[in-house]
Amino acid sequence: MIHDEFYWISQINKASVVSNSEEKLLDETTAKLAARGIVTVEQQAEADTSKRVKKYIAYEPMVIAATGPEVTILHAGRSSQDILSTMRVAILREQTIALCEALDAVIGKILALAEEHRDTVVPNYTNGVAAQPNSYAHYLLGFAAAFLRDRERLNQCLVRYNECPMGATVLNGTGWPLNRDTMAKLLGFDRPRLNAFDCTCETPVDFALEVSSVAASIGVHVGSMINDIMVQYAQSRPWIILQEGGENTYVSSAMPQKRNPGLMNYCRGDASDVVSEMTAVFTL
């Protein structure tokens, strides 16, 4: 499940209450008041989605309104910058995990199809011209190998960026004795990220750059595989016939004997969109 910004702001505040209470930075009365305030804000947002804000500077006034100004001590040693960075990394981490799961499903389908067609012989092409016979399994495993490399890159990203920016404040850090190790653990990270400047200025950008580049690589491999299939499907005597019906193919509105590869077209278009969106990420 991919959670939104409001969810993660709430989680960060809850983690701050627990961690700061353990470190005696909050007395028991203030900690309970802050916790009740966070729950109240969550309940208000559940009843009115317009209150499901995406920025901490809009969230904090709602907590103050539900409790009182004394709860602002919770923000000591923090900044909207380390909160924003933590929120972005946490959301991108969930999105990356979702991408891993989707890619696993694709790889699993390819491997199952390869197992089914170990002895199926098909033509392979270079420069659009039939070149050599090949087993369909071997051909499919070539694409599986490419997707597995993409999967490995995603794993590496998840490991590399599963470090928590929270508690870095902004730029030069803080002298307020926050327990960043506890904060990282409570938010599901392996450890805190060490350099405060990196935490708030570079980490969320780098994570987005790496994941978008891997997503684009997946898009290129998807496009390559679909192109091969569509070239064969378009021939007068294709050796690949798409299963009809559903979203897979649709009947031409003018030529009822014609079956257009709808799902292939849409998927290829989506893959191209991913590659173009990667360019946008690198341009920002």
Language model segments and positions:
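A conserved active-site cap/scaffold subdomain adjacent to cofactor or substrate pockets
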Residues: 204-239, 246-284
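A short secondary-structure junction motif
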Residues: 70, 113-120, 190, 232, ...
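A helix-coil-helix interface module used to build multimeric assemblies
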Residues: 1-173, 178-185, 248-252, 262-268
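Internal metal/ion-chelating core segments
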Residues: 138-235, 240
